[in-house]
Amino acid sequence: MRMGRVHYPTYRIVAVDSRVKRDGKYIALIGHLNPALKENKCKIDEAVALEWLNKGAKPTDTVRSLFSQTGLWKKFVESKKKPVAKSK
């Protein structure tokens, strides 16, 4: 969700129902992104993000990229891996 002034955007990373318009009401605020900053551009609440991913939320390509940069996507993939039972 784009916020901010003209030429100085900030973005909210949110969980939204797929039937709601793009900038409509969101379910949960997961984090925010400020591309104008040199450091700490992105702040994500990992607990909330993992909760929604485990519930089946599908992140956009851009959000998945942000999750990868912060290491959150790797944690999610590792939590989904199940040990394979060896047959004798």
Curated annotation (Swiss-Prot):
A single GO BP: translation
Protein name stated in the entry: Small ribosomal subunit protein bS16
Keywords: Ribonucleoprotein, Ribosomal protein
One example GO MF annotation: structural constituent of ribosome
NCBIfam families: S16 (TIGR00002)
Family of the protein in this entry: Belongs to the bacterial ribosomal protein bS16 family.
Record-linked Pfam families: Ribosomal_S16 (PF00886)
Gene3D superfamilies: 3.30.1320.10
Disulfide bonds: none
Keyword Ribonucleoprotein part of the UniProt annotation: yes
GO cellular component: cytoplasm; small ribosomal subunit
